[in-house]
């Protein structure tokens, strides 16, 4: 049987130093080599990320002795066991496949060009919470084309009633629809009520509850083409007539609007974004964000209005949206 710790470790490291993190986590962080070695001593299918991204001796800015000690001890024990044929040689990360971590309501799909999409359900009352139910990240070759910002600078306000006035903790700093110009709400009751992975590699999320009373239904379907790395996200939203719906995506990378598409430029690749069900122009807004180290970052928010149909004599408005991204060289 696969233990929960083993399963999480197997799936949470993506490629090129990227790992699955939400809320106050950092997807660009290093990984604990000691823990990886400890698990590899016990389980034969543990995979090792590139050692370039292993946490160094000085990787913990707080210099916590117990973590440093076990990191050193478990690594040396594993290397001795490999040399003495008591443990298997390290194996690299897998570059394809899919996995759902149902208790956490996280899902990971991997595809060509080292692409990965990571989606979450959960609720807005989690530890170190951000209002991010239904959000996702899109990575290619170690670059985050649609990102999760992780923790901001820890200040007094960050852990007060002003927490959700800070950009990185709000829904608008995540890849989720904005409905009625209001944020998702904080609290455990604001949650996903459906989160599943189909045999066809579709992630299905229902998360109207995260918005409170503004939305009657919010369905999201996410699909990653394993052979090409193309990402497709379809949103179906029912709300009160007259309520405006906006798609909202965030990235740290440079963005431009070209030929009715959005181009997100990474160091190795570009991502081309097309949107169906769009009303009006793409709007690109740059927001200043103090990251966990207190360093100022410019975050590009990509937003557009979604066409909303209001059937005659109906008490609901219906918004359908389709987002497609593909990676170019």
Describe the function of each predicted region:
Residues 1-145, 198:
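Carbohydrate-active enzyme catalytic cores, enriched for enzymes
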Residues 24-25, 32-37, 49-69, 154-329:
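CBM-like, beta-strand-rich accessory domains located in the C-terminal region of large
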Residues 146-150:
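Catalytic Cys-His active-site segments of thiol-dependent hydrolases/isopeptidases
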Residues 123, 151, 238:
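Short, glycine/acidic-enriched loop or turn micro-motifs at the edges of active sites
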């Amino acid at each position: 049987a696969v233990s929960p710790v083993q399963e999480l470790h197997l799936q949470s490291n993506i490629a090129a130093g990227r790992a699955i993190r939400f809320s106050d986590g950092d997807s660009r962080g290093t990984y604990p080599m000691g823990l990886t070695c400890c698990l590899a001593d016990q389980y034969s299918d543990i995979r090792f990320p590139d050692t370039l991204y292993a946490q160094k001796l000085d990787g913990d800015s707080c210099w916590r002795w117990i973590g440093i000690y076990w990191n050193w001890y478990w690594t040396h024990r594993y290397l001795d066991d490999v040399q003495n044929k008591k443990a298997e040689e390290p194996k690299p990360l897998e570059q394809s496949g899919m996995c759902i971590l149902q208790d956490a309501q996280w899902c990971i799909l991997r595809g060509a060009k080292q692409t990965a999409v990571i989606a979450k359900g959960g609720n807005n009352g989690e530890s170190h919470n951000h209002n991010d139910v239904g959000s996702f990240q899109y990575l290619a070759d170690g670059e985050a084309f649609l990102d999760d910002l992780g923790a901001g600078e820890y200040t007094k306000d960050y852990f007060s009633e002003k927490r959700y006035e800070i950009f990185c903790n709000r829904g608008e700093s995540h890849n989720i629809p904005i409905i009625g110009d209001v944020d998702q709400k904080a609290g455990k009751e604001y949650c996903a009520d459906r989160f599943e992975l189909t045999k066809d590699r579709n992630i299905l999320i229902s998360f109207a509850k995260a918005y409170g009373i503004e939305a009657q239904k919010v369905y999201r379907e996410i699909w990653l083409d394993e052979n090409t790395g193309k990402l497709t996200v379809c949103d179906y939203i029912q709300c009160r007539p007259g309520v405006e719906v906006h798609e909202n995506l965030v990235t740290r990378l440079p963005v431009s609007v070209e030929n009715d598409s959005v181009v997100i430029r990474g160091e190795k690749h570009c991502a081309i974004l097309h949107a169906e069900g769009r009303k009006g122009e793409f709007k690109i807004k740059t927001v200043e964000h103090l990251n966990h180290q207190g360093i100022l970052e410019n975050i590009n928010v990509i937003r557009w209005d979604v066409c909303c149909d209001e059937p005659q004599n109906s008490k609901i408005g219906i918004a359908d949206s389709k987002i497609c991204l593909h990676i170019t060289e």
